[in-house]
Amino acid sequence: MASSLRALYAVLAMVLLGVLASRSALASGAVTLVLPYLAWGTLIIGVCYRVWRWARVPVPFRIPTTCGQQRSLPWLPRAPLENPDNAMGAALRVGFEVLLFRSLLRNNRPRIEEGRLAFSPTRALWLGALAMHWALLVIVLRHLRFALEPTPNWVVSLGALDGMLQIGAPPVLLTDLALFAALLYLLIRRWRDPALRYLSLFSDYFALWLLLGIALSGIAMRYVWRVDVVAVKQLVLGIVTFHPQVLSAPAPLLLVHLLLVCALAIYLPFSKLMHLGAAVLSPTRNLANNSRRRRHVNPWNAPVPTHGYAEWEAEFADKLKLAGLPLEQDQDARHPTAD
């Protein structure tokens, strides 16, 4: 019951945002004049603050998580990507993690099968997450055509590649379908799985519903209730060049879409959606595993008085001689080294 209420609250929050955009923004123009700058200022400052906080956390130990053979004897095959021993390997590992979600691809889910513990891969989750993130990235890059004048050729080519199937008019974009299907799958998965539903918080549902609301409002503006693309570009260019303007013709769906995007920008630095920065800055990912070849001394350790072997041997020399044990200082005296 509690998990159902959390999902319902997330839906109600989305409806409230939509009503707020369609009602108040038409009268005051707050969504087009004030909110974009507030949202992007919060996003930039919030992300920089979170990264600064993470960067200040001390890492006293080298703690990379590995799943392959590290560099060792020459005749042992090693895994340079799974267990990197230098900075280049660690950078490649982080890059593949960010771009391909390799740890999620290897993720297994435990289950009880015929009274025994079994593990099954979660390839569907990996594919859904990968499709959602890549589709979202391509959509953001496509939207640069509204913020840049003239539009770069690579943005035009990216839009043409996205609509290469040429289905309908305007053509159906593959990333629109991929983003909608991936978000719907992630929502259904979180709702159908009893254990996952029990562990889900309001923030988990709200992030998915917010992204789904942005996707649906954008799809509706392209295929159902079309808006004036020229007016949209003028609006976005005005925001980017710090000359904001109010829409000449009412466009409630566009205002809802813009409000949801601004809400996402404000919400992102304070939510789990900041996991991209965490993946890059995580010491379990971005450190090389070379502790066997190189000693890493904690720079902020307090100086500790040491008692080396030479001092220990000098202290107990008489007892060692009585026990008949050889002394290194005697051997050094018999075999002096030439300078």
Report residues per predicted region:
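Long, contiguous internal "core" modules enriched in hydrophobic/ aromatic residues
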Residues: A27, L104-F242, V246-P252, V256, ...
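Alpha-helical transmembrane segments of integral membrane proteins, especially early/N-terminal helices
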Residues: A2-L12, V51, N83-F96, L125-R142
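Long, hydrophobic/aromatic-enriched structural stretches that serve as scaffold segments
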Residues: A10-G18, A87-A118, T122-L125
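Membrane-proximal intrinsically disordered regions of secretory-pathway and membrane-system proteins
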Residues: A2-L5, V11-V15, L20-A25, L38-I45, ...
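Long, highly hydrophobic alpha-helical transmembrane signal-anchor segments
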Residues: L5-T66, L237-V256
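Membrane-interface amphipathic/juxtamembrane segments adjacent to transmembrane helices
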Residues: L35-L99, N290-R294
